[in-house]
């Protein structure tokens, strides 16, 4: 007995992220949208990402490969997480917003709602249920596209970038205080 749920949003995954955040207070009204393509031997791998930070304390990242939800994430999730942490830290360091330490991935992702969608000519999954993408080349592809495009977005939207850094700093301080308590 297989359960199928179908989503259709006029604005694509940007609108989907907006809907997922409807009960939260968004830190920035615009849903950040990033896309890019990289060529591999078998054809093109395209990456699309929509993300928005809110006042929530948890992160919510949904992963898709060729429109199929991968509930256990996979290599696209790894690429996204790495690029997010690096790009937020780079922006913060370049603007001298950090005092010494870098932000952890966990701190950067606090309050994040994101959807990462990969279209791949020949994806590999951990099982037939396609719950987890294991195509190793996808990590680097997602990482490079997200790092580059998110860096550009931060340069063009410094007030949003600063809010994201400040949210990460608050998360870091709270985590540190909890550790010492």
Q: What kind of feature is each model-predicted range?
A:
Residues 1-181:
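GHKL-family ATPase ATP-binding module
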